[in-house]
Amino acid sequence: MLVMSITFSFVAVALLVYFYVKVRTSFSPDAYAKTMQQEVIKMIRDIRYEADIAVQMLEKKIGECNQVVRTIDRKLTLLNEEILKEHTARTLFRASGAGQETREEVCARPEHRSAPSRAGSSAAKPTPTKRGTIEVYNEKIIRDNGLRAESPLLKDAIIALSEKGLAPEFIAEKTGKPLGEVQLLINLSR
């Protein structure tokens, strides 16, 4: 029995030493540092993973924004070309004097022979000279059919811009036409 108690004593001392070393290493500053280092490494991995996902999403959004910018740039280029064409056409139209007639030409038409003074204003009437039954005026007038003389070109430009997907408000702003007139032209073209 003595042997057994000595054996148990050695086992107890061995267990005591083992648990002492185990507790001392588990709660030592080195153990805390090692545990913290492992947690920091794990957090760094998580942050890198989340950052990679965020960068991929950001790159995707940047690509979409670049596509939208290219589309807008293409539409603005087309719009500038159309505005330049419309401005050139308007300038040529005004320079050629098209759309203007003298009162002599208007009064020479059969439908205007009976009432030559209808087109004149009451403020300052030019003096007519008689040539048979046609009164000749030297003042120039512009035919007015409800729309301006340049409206066929402008109408085509408005319709083309609306077919390209531009908003009626934007078209009205850029062409100088009222919004209602632009919307009417767009709706009539459909």
From Swiss-Prot:
Membrane-spanning residues: 1-21
Keywords, ordered alphabetically: Membrane, Transmembrane, Transmembrane helix
Subcellular location field: Membrane
Membrane topology: Single-pass membrane protein
Basic and acidic residues: compositionally biased ranges: 103-114
Region (Disordered): 103-130
Recorded coiled-coil stretches: none
GO cellular component terms, semicolon-separated: membrane
Principal cellular location given in the protein's record: membrane
Disulfide cross-links: none
Family membership noted in the UniProt record: To B.burgdorferi BB0265.
Protein name (Swiss-Prot/TrEMBL): Uncharacterized protein TP_0711
Species name: Treponema pallidum (strain Nichols)
